[in-house]
C-alpha cells in the first residue's frame, strides 16, 4: 500500500487542499484532549499541521509511506509546527506514553483489507490510549448504489485512474493508469461497532457529518468518537 501512496504523494496536496470539512472537527477533539495526540495515516500532514497549530502541541503522526512523510516534514517546517513523524504500520501501533487522543481522518481505515486487520488496529489503539482517552475516525457510509455507479469510471485527477467495484467484498479498487492500485474496503455501521466491542472501546458519538449532524439514511459519512 505504501508504494501506491508514494505514487500519489507529489499531487496529493493539490487534491486534498479542497478537503477541509474534517479539520475543525479533529482540531476540537485535540483541544479537549489530555495527553499526547496521535494521528494514524498522517499522510502529508493535511490535518496534523492545523491540529498542531491550533493546540500549540506536537502531534505524533504514523504513516507507511516514506514519500508522504517526507512531504509532511517539509510542510511542518514551513508552517513552524512540531510533528513527530514515524514510518510504521497502524496495525502495529506503539507509543511511549498513553495518548489522550488517537484519530484517523481521511477515511484511511478503509485501506485495511480485512476485518482482522482492523481488529488488530483497534486493539493496538485501545492499548495505546490512556483511561478515558478518545479514538476518532471517519469513513464512507457504505452505499452499494454509489459504489456501483462509479464502477468502471475513469478520472484524470488527482492522477489518471479508473474505479472498479467488487460486489463480493464491498471493495473499490482505484487503479492508476500506470498500473498501481489502491483499494478501499467499505464497512457497515455494525461492523465498526463490532470492532469497538472486541477492542474494549465504548462508543461516545456517531455522527453523519462533521458539524455533528445526526446519522440518517441520507448520510454519506460515518464520524465515530469512542473512548477507552
Predicted regions and their residues:
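A short glycine-rich, Lys/Arg-flanked "PGG" loop and its adjoining helix->strand segment in the class I
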Residues: 119-131
